[in-house]
């Protein structure tokens, strides 16, 4: 396996940003023939408001929400994107139960809702902090393709 990490896919919008990073399968231990399953990390950040002097938006990555997408989560998202793009898909994680849970641990909810030609990715921690990023059709097609291809790398196939 290559030690290089794939390039993250990022969507920047006025309300916030969404970043997907593939973490491929890796060896369980040194010299082990077995692999540890990978994942896709979803990070979302709010916009800090007004653009800087050069017109670039600034995002609050220090207060981002991180959501680890397992192969099952990715399967749920792909099934929604391919077969049920009306309504919403909801994924819930309780990160406080994870070993070594950090300060940002708690109930995390990911909702992906669709309208005619756009999708809204909403990520929240409990009910206290929520980030919403709209995603257009072109971006959603790329997300679907990357997640579909990413499944094979998560399993190391």
Labelled PLM ranges:
Residues 1-157:
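Positively charged, low-complexity terminal tracts
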